[in-house]
Structure formats: structure tokens, C-alpha cells
Amino acid sequence: MTCSQPNLRVTIIAADGLYKRDVFRFPDPFAVATVGGEQTHTTSVIKKTLNPYWNEMFDLRVNEDSILAIQIFDQKKFKKKDQGFLGVINVRIGDVIDLQMGGDEMLTRDLKKSNDNLVVHGKLIINLSTNLSTPNTNQANGLHRSHMQPSTSSGLVPQVSASTPQPSPGPSQADPTASNPSLHPQRVPSTTRPSSTIVPANGPPAPPNGQQGSRTNLSSFEDSQGRLPAGWERREDNLGRTYYVDHNTRTTTWTRPSNNYNEQTSRTQREASMQLERRAHQSRMLPEDRTGASSPNLQENQQQAQTPPAGGSASAVSMMATGATTAGTGELPPGWEQRTTPEGRPYFVDHNTRTTTWVDPRRQQYIRMYGQNANGTNTTIQQQPVSQLGPLPSGWEMRLTNTARVYFVDHNTKTTTWDDPRLPSSLDQGVPQYKRDFRRKLIYFRSQPALRIMSGQCHVKVRRNNIFEDSYAEIMRQSASDLKKRLMIKFDGEDGLDYGGLSREFFFLLSHEMFNPFYCLFEYSAHDNYTLQINPHSGVNPEHLNYFKFIGRVVGLAIFHRRFLDSFFIGAFYKMMLRKKVSLQDMEGVDEDLHRNLTWTLDNDIEGIIELTFAVDDEKFGERRTIDLKPGGRDIPVTNENKGEYVELVTEWKIVKRVEEQFNAFMSGFNELIPADLVNVFDERELELLIGGIADIDVDDWKKHTDYRGYQESDEVIQNFWKIVRTWDAEQKSRLLQFTTGTSRIPVNGFKDLQGSDGPRRFTIEKSGDPGALPKSHTCFNRLDLPPYKTNDVLEHKLSIAVEETLGFGQE
């Protein structure tokens, strides 16, 4: 029997991912709640959105057999035949809440079709509560997080938590049982749709066998193959890619867990995968590291001064003293002084530049650089007196081997090299320009005083199972100057001295954790499922700017101490770090659909076809705003004459302006360790290699998982292509990978797991183009358009030019 007084409070919180029936406009949705056809309540209308947020409450009279129906309509079409129907849910009250016992339940339901069978899409989140004593205006703010059902939406849960901002504890104060975990980085829910970030469960992981979730939303915990293992949830990102969330371990995967899933087996598999990634990460190097030798325990004695740098034979260039000198007689140049070490070895002080050297400035020593000419024979490339090169950079010293060969010691980093850091390039003319530039830039970059390790030690102690929080506390409490001291990493409960191995492990583990989309600070790009971009809605965590500053410090710290991070970003992110202007091409990795639409707009006549203004709609935590791209933009129509400006402004807003606050916080931390004027010597592709290193690429695996269009694997062009790739060194291969796929990163399981913008996408070589043209790349599809070149030499020449001269991450 129905109660005479209201006994249930229904809160219609939000809908997510509604179906868009019009190409160029969004609906104006509102919801209608009815019980038994007698009680009807209507929410307000939310303008222009697919993700409306109402958070409106209604008190109803119900019994356990009552059916609560909530329909969503588009107000703009409400007077039409279909009333702008967008979906409906029907809930039997007795199935979800015990009216006698009382309770509070959060429901997330898939929207269903009506009898008209119109296409619908999305979910609806509501709250049912028997507690009517609290004021309606505060009801939604008091929702019990422990009953909140994880949503496929990445834009709904934050709207609830954001309404009650509370101070977020620092990472070092993490508590798994915190009453408001959604504000902690390890519990932050993802915040935007569209987004491929992970939406963690608010509160405890899902109970075994779906005891709680099974009543409210079975579809998230099962698929066509049956029910998922306990604690697992199936979701889709905005690109329609299915991924799985393991709430037991707070991890995500693109692979469905098997029905005979075992947590221990899964943990073992994750450890094996992590070990593969660790080995790949630790094998990454840079060109300077490959040709010079590291000597961590360099001794300042004369005997070692006669020891040549190990690995010098790897260099393509030999630098030797000619033996031609002038007599070291007469007075020293003005400002110079001769001194003697305690061992009796003379050295010279230049008070003009405040530097010291073993070389007598009165002696005119010549440096001769050797390389190979086109015939493969050695020839002199350059010969010039040392005195004309100026002083060595701070912390550098020139020495001679016992065979009179010159080498250089960098006391800042305790490394040695055959290459004179003052020379523009010590590589032979046959080496590609980009490689000469990159190595030259590295030598210059690392020789600067701002990159010199300061005296003392910087101790960082962390727990492996709490590395994000501990690292935040340790790194943010220290000054930038302290972080420039020798880095000493200590893992709690483990004995060991850090001679490089521990710090490499530290950056490997930390980069896996802090860039995890689970925390909502970063999200996967539209290009694939392993490159990252800033989450524009990271503000669900009120402390997010502090975390971005921390992450900036970590990236700077890794570069400063010559360590690599196991994370890779979209090309536009590296451009932004270099303060370069982004282009429409960069949009491809951020929003492929928008990139395609903007490209169509540029290439076609839009007069009378589409109506656009210099404004965009943006949704943040349920609030939809119109943003002018230029003053008064919402009143300025887009025409064929100004559409180029429109595309440029939309691109800048989508890539830069939406995350400007987060990015500035990131750069403030980064520039505390790496000055902006120094990092700007690199281009965006070089910066990716500087941060992530250069991997050893398995050409056999690459070739094995390659498809061909218009070619056969046995064709001469294809045979020559792979022959050329095999002869290239690791850096050239990484450059080719950047050119064709947009990133130098290789999936953990090799090229078989290569991803494109629309899911798994194998590397493809297509027969396309005139033999006189350069190869082209399509990074969204991992495709190389390779013309049918007649000879191996022409192929190598054209391919090298395409790879080294391309400014962006691919030409199309």
C-alpha cells in the first residue's frame, strides 16, 4: 500500500554520453521522473550538452512494487513527433532498496530505447535515499561514497565530488581508508568525457561476485563472453575502445581477464611484463652515451690521465694531436698564470675566464679531425689550432693519451669523450644532419654550468608500494638547488648504495605511477593507448596544480641526472615544452574526429553548408560554457575567407588553452632544474629522446608484424627497405619510428601490439607516390607511403631526407 507521505528521495544527478542526433548541434536535455503515472517531476533544462548535470531532488511516495521511470528528452525537439526522446530507465524500487530497513543507494543505469526503437546511448546516474530529514539542497552533497557505483562515464562522478571540495592530503599522507578518497591522487576519479582516462571506484573495490553492483548495473561487470571476475569492470573510452579496470589492484588493461582469472597468476604476469619494460627502459641511451665512456670513479691521478676513453672506437671520427707545436717560451698571455699540482704537474690558470687547463697557452697545438669520404677512405675534414676554439666549458679538461691522442674529461658528470665540446660537430660529413645536430646539442647542453651537479648529496627515501606519495613528499620538500646535488635513492627496507642502478629503478617505477591515467592527471591520447596528454579536467583534485609542478620537477630531475622516464607524450606536448606554436597536424593525436572535421572545413566550401562562429562550447563538471576564440567571437560567423584563422584558433584552444593552467604548473617545476633557454636548443623529436632515451629496436620483430599494400614482401623495394633499416643505428631507427608512428615508443610485447587511432594497427608499407618524391607517413595509421624507387641508393637517400627533414611527427 502506498504511503500517504513521501518516503523516498530521488536525486537525478546526471546523464553521460547521450546520443547526438544532429551533426552540428548538441541537445538541450531535461529529465522527467514518474511513479505509477500519478507523480511526475521534471528537472531543469541543461543547454547544449551530451553530459547534462542536474543534481535535482524529488520526494516521492512509493512502495516496493512501485516502478520509477525516468525519461530524458531534448527540449528543442519536444514538440516534434518523437519529442526528442534520448532514453529511459525503469527501476523497481524493491529491487534496489529496502524501504523498511532504510538506506541510500547510488544507481548507474544504461539508457534504454522506447517503443519507437530510436537509437539511444549513454547512462543515467541517480540516487535513492530513505533519509528525508536533511534539506533537499544538500542531499546530493551528502552522498555516501561507499555506495557509489563506478560509472563508464568519465564526467559524472567528479561532478558529485566537486560540489563538496575538501582539503586534499598530500601524497605522503595517503590513507586507503580516507573518508574522501576522491580528492587524493591515488583515488582521483577521471573527469571528462570524451576521455580515455580511468575512472576508479570511489571507495572500496567492488565486492566479490558483484554483490553490490549486480543489483544496479550488471552491464559494466559482464560482456558477451559472460561475467567478469570479481572486482573487474568493463568500460569504453570516447573512441569506443574497450578496456578493463581491476579494482582489486587499481590497474587497467586493454586485455579481457579470462574466466578462470586468478589474482596470483595475474600478479605474476604483471611482474613479468614489468620486468620486460624495465629491461627495455634500462637499455635506453643517447648518442653521446653510446660513443663516450662513463667513468663514475674517475681518479685525478696522472696515470689515469694517460688512459684513453673506453669505447672511443665507436666514434665515427678520430681526433688526434698532430704533434705540430710552437715553442712554449716567452711570457704567458695577459691574465694567465702557471701553477703546479702537489704531484709536480704544471697547469695553467686563465683568470680572464676563471678556468684551468693542462695545455700551455704558448704552445700552438693543432686538432685534426678524420672522417670518411664518399669512397670510404679516411680524409682530413678539419684542422684548426686549439687556441682559436676558445676555452673549454666549465668543468671540462683536455688530456692526452700515451699515444698523444687528445680526449676530454667532463668533471661535472665524471665522463670522458673523444669529442671536443667546443667544436660544432665532431662527426664526419657522411652522417645525417639531424644526428650531427643532436649530438652537438647534447654536448653543448650537458656542458652548461646550469647542468652541473652541485657538491653534496640529495637523499630520497621511498617505499616501492607507495612511491608516488613518498616521492611527492621528498621532492617537494627540497629546494631546487638541493635536487641538483648527487641523487641518492634509498628504497625502504632494502640495502644498497646508489651508483646509478637505484636511481634508474626509481625513475622507472615513478614514471609508471605518476603518469597512470588512474589518477586523472594524464589521459591516453586519441592516437594510441600508450602516449599521454594532460587531462583537461584534472581539476577534480583541488591539489592538481601542485602535482603537475611535482611532475615537472621529476621530468627536470631525470634530465638533469641523465636518467630516462618510461613515459611518452603526444607530439604537441613536446612542442609546448619548447614554446613552439602547435598546428592542425598536432590535433590528430588529441582529437581525431575534430582534426578530420577541421581538415574538411579547410578543404571545402562551407558557405551555406555549416554555420559556425568564432566560439566553442566547453563542458566542465557538468557546466557547459561558450568560449569566444577572439573578442566577440560568438557573433562573428566563419566564412571561406576567415576559416583558416578559425581552424588555427580552435587548434590552439583545444591543445593549449584548455590545459594552460596545468601546463604552466608543470613547466614551473621543470624550469627549476632545466632552464628554458637551454632545453630550447632541441626540437620536439629530440626532446622526446632526451626524456625517454633511445631504445634498441628489433628489426626482425618489426618486419614480422608489417603489412604491405601494393607490395609483396619479396619485392626488391621492400627487401632494400629492410636492408637499409638493419644498417641504421638505434638513433636512426628511432627517428624512423617517430616519423611513421608518431613516437619512438615500442609496445611492451613488441610490434604486434602496435596501436593506431582506431585500435590495433600494424605497421604498413603502401606503394604510393612518384619515384621522384619523398616517402610520406600517416602516423594515425602507422603507415608509410613508399614510392617504387629503382635503386637501393635512391631509396636510402630519399628515406633519410624524409626522416631527418620532417619538422613534425609525420607529414600527414
From Swiss-Prot:
PANTHER family linked to this entry: E3 UBIQUITIN-PROTEIN LIGASE NEDD-4, HECT DOMAIN UBIQUITIN-PROTEIN LIGASE
The protein's name in its UniProt record: Probable E3 ubiquitin-protein ligase hulA
Organism: Aspergillus flavus (strain ATCC 200026 / FGSC A1120 / IAM 13836 / NRRL 3357 / JCM 12722 / SRRC 167)
Localization of this protein: Cytoplasm
Metabolic or biological pathway: Protein modification; protein ubiquitination
Oligomer and partners: Interacts with creD.
BP-aspect Gene Ontology terms: cellular response to heat; cellular response to L-arginine; chromatin organization; free ubiquitin chain polymerization; mitochondria-associated ubiquitin-dependent protein catabolic process; mitochondrion organization; nonfunctional rRNA decay; poly(A)+ mRNA export from nucleus
UniProt GO cellular component terms: cellular bud tip; cytosolic ribosome; endosome membrane; Golgi apparatus; nucleus; RSP5-BUL ubiquitin ligase complex; ubiquitin ligase complex
